[in-house]
Amino acid sequence: MKYMNLSIEELHELLKNGEVTSKELIEESLKLSHEVQEKYNAFVTILDDAKEMPITDNVLSGIPFGVKDNYSTKGVLSTGSSNTLKNYVPFFDATAYEKLKNAGAIMVNKTVMDEFGM
């Protein structure tokens, strides 16, 4: 992994300077997500169709991230790691996720947790 050990600030500088693209970061994040999934079953969902975003001055712009599965993410399976919600796909975004998305961050996976995060 070439970029995943760098800080958000370091990644943002590389993005701003054109030394790396958001697409490259997404691809590396997805590759790592699949490797971790095979070994640890750490994700409810891996978003292989995550899209590159335009880079802005916001430090989160173009940065891939994972979100706990108890956050509602519009159009993406959000189970709370519970069989009760095993097919739940929300029609809205949780405020915290919406703020990350509006800042230009790119969700690449939903992480497993104890049922309902309890």
Predicted features by range, described:
Residues L100:
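Nucleotide-cofactor and metal-assisted catalytic machinery
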Residues M1-V89, D93-A94, M113-M118:
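Short, well-ordered alpha-helical
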Residues A103:
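Conserved dinucleotide-binding and phosphotransfer motif residues
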